């Protein structure tokens, strides 16, 4: 009995050791042939999960797996052979019927004979402890075909115990988590952790950016240390943040099922795996199991010059308001990204002056080394003969979706050279600031070019001797928003003269809340309350805005409220409107304002009944569950009724994240002499000036001057028409996302989203002494096209989903002031044109031989035009300003 017990324990001990030896990964039995059924399928849709509404394809086959060699030093060192046989390609959507692109075609016709032969050649997999040590295949096989074999081979890499580790497979070097439970193992691959060389870029701005999500789960059913069934599912979903109808999803599945086992070839003996492989076939070579990049053959693709000729007519100046112009702009950018410098230069040099600005927009927006070299060779900054082209180039740089260090380095080099136009020199510095901001947002603050640009901006601001240079560096800092620049801004805000002081405060206004420290707020309070010196109204009101928009304290709010009633007349009304707007629109400061208003000393009739024409109002353009867009308009007048500043802002929100889409600020000063009026306190010695400062998609652009100085004003009044001055005009690449994906199945996927717009912002200021009336106009006209393109490619069959949306919108702001009486009459109008919105969806499946299936859908709606509401006082005033002419009661001569 004791002897039996000892023998039993020895048996258990040896059995346990054997199991332990096999728990690290799959283990094949000697001299057995495993016959399996394998399929990989992929389908694309807009995220609705309806298979009948999707496009895609399925590749299926039989698979033979045998163990060729096992190391005599350990069971977990194995060499296995995997052979794909009996390949089929068919629709994933079985309801396609007669429309199936595979109908009547055999695998050699679909895949091509040479590709099919390569696909069915065996591969060898060297596994140690369940992990891939080497992957062996034949050289010179098409990468796309090798990737399909890699996708199958990667399924055999797994471990039988729970835990988290890193594995290298077709997806790259990835973090994976195993969950083992009895005869089932689940492998979760963190796709965002995978290290693999793939091209791609994205727009870092959260509002204009794309949200993508990827998951990969593989479930193994294990029996006798080998797979009975494997099911892998990989999902990639994408959506545009502010327009969620631009969305798509790729679902890729792999299924592997054991059908039977039968007698197989005997194990090969030997200690070195290299000798075994050579004995099997000396042509085998070790290649990476990580998926390799391949380019599909492009049949009938046009050259750059051919494509340019096909889209050129749509980019003529008269056609820029049409959506076809923006679509042509986007497609041309895609062609430019694969073009060489010489090809691009050839087109630039051959074009006429009318179409060159649009061509410069496109070449700059391509953002490739070749396109940058071409445009820099083409433009001559030492000449003043092509200023429009230089400015269009610089604006396109400022709006760049994914700028690199080389672009910034090029602009720094240009700035240190000579210029034919001082306006262009200013624009270069302003755009340098914008690029610094974008590169820092992309974790590039320590790049040498960024460090050099910071020194250039801050050093230039500190040493500037001319007013124009100070303004230029302040505008650059307004774009860059460098924390280290705040002490300089505080110095200029408090001590400098009016325009510089105002620009310094508006620059501080652009900083995020964490940078508006107690020290900053103390300075803003001193400016607003004029404790050290007298400041212009524009400076004081902007300082108040900085305080109120950045977590104001109880005493800060109370002191601002108590000041109302002690300010100049129009400033009283303006500050009162600001407070009322905060309360009505429930801005962050509204809770603190309500707390303070519980005190009677702050909340009384005298304070809240101040008259005047200045105003502030915020409202919604559109409001949805995920996003919203708002407009705000505040206008400050001088005591004599002349416009001092109008500020129009449009913000786009995704959740609580804002994008400052548009800001148009019109400023005027020193015009009181025209109507023999008395200037306000602190503004007695201001030169006559009017200008417009634009900000577009978070990028401050160079301000435009209407007139500067009394003589310039008089000449403009006597000679100028009411034609508006163009402030910003051009084509902008606003959204730019490109992602190349290596699917676990071996297929290649691409997800791209592009958004472009044609924009035209113009402004005018009309002044009539005869009618004692002034008019200010700001016109915004935009045409927007957004395209999403998702494809899955095997090199012999391709499925794709294209979604696009387009719209045209116009917004006009008119301020009319009649100062023939006092109080003067003011009417503000904000009108929006009717907005057509169109959405298109195209789904397709296409063989490399040309046969295809296409499905198209279209949706169109019209949003009626409207006049945006402003405060009630404005509505009443407009009725007086535009009162109908009284009808004559007499029909005779007298």
From Swiss-Prot:
Domain Vitellogenin: 28-662
GO BP of this protein: cholesterol homeostasis; lipoprotein metabolic process; phospholipid transport; plasma lipoprotein particle assembly; protein secretion; triglyceride transport
UniProt superkingdom: Eukaryota
Gene Ontology terms, MF aspect: ceramide 1-phosphate transfer activity; cholesterol transfer activity; lipid binding; phosphatidylcholine transfer activity; phosphatidylethanolamine transfer activity; phospholipid transfer activity; phospholipid transporter activity; protein heterodimerization activity
Disulphide bond pairs: 174-194
InterPro entries, per the entry: Lipid_transp_b-sht_shell, Lipovitellin_superhlx_dom, MTP_lip-bd, MTTP, Vitellinogen_b-sht_N, Vitellogenin_N
Signal peptide residues on this chain, from the entry's feature table: 1-18
Assigned keywords, A-Z: Disulfide bond, Endoplasmic reticulum, Golgi apparatus, Lipid transport, Lipid-binding, Signal, Transport
Gene3D superfamilies cross-referenced by the UniProt entry: Lipovitellin, beta-sheet shell regions, chain A (2.30.230.10), Vitellinogen, superhelical (1.25.10.20)
Transmembrane segments: none
GO cellular component entries: basolateral plasma membrane; endoplasmic reticulum; Golgi apparatus
Chemical reaction(s) catalysed: a 1,2-diacyl-sn-glycero-3-phosphocholine(in) = a 1,2-diacyl-sn-glycero-3-phosphocholine(out); a 1,2-diacyl-sn-glycero-3-phosphoethanolamine(in) = a 1,2-diacyl-sn-glycero-3-phosphoethanolamine(out); a cholesterol ester(in) = a cholesterol ester(out); a triacyl-sn-glycerol(in) = a triacyl-sn-glycerol(out)
Record's subcellular location: Endoplasmic reticulum; Golgi apparatus
Keyword Secreted listed: no
Main subcellular location of this protein, as a coarse class: endoplasmic reticulum
Assembly and oligomerization: Heterodimer; heterodimerizes with the protein disulfide isomerase (P4HB/PDI). Interacts with APOB. Interacts with PRAP1.
Role played: Catalyzes the transport of triglyceride, cholesteryl ester, and phospholipid between phospholipid surfaces. Required for the assembly and secretion of plasma lipoproteins that contain apolipoprotein B. May be involved in regulating cholesteryl ester biosynthesis in cells that produce lipoproteins.
PANTHER family associated with the record: MICROSOMAL TRIGLYCERIDE TRANSFER PROTEIN LARGE SUBUNIT, MICROSOMAL TRIGLYCERIDE TRANSFER PROTEIN, LARGE SUBUNIT
Entry protein name: Microsomal triglyceride transfer protein large subunit
Lineage per the UniProt record: Eukaryota, Metazoa, Chordata, Craniata, Vertebrata
Gene designation: MTTP
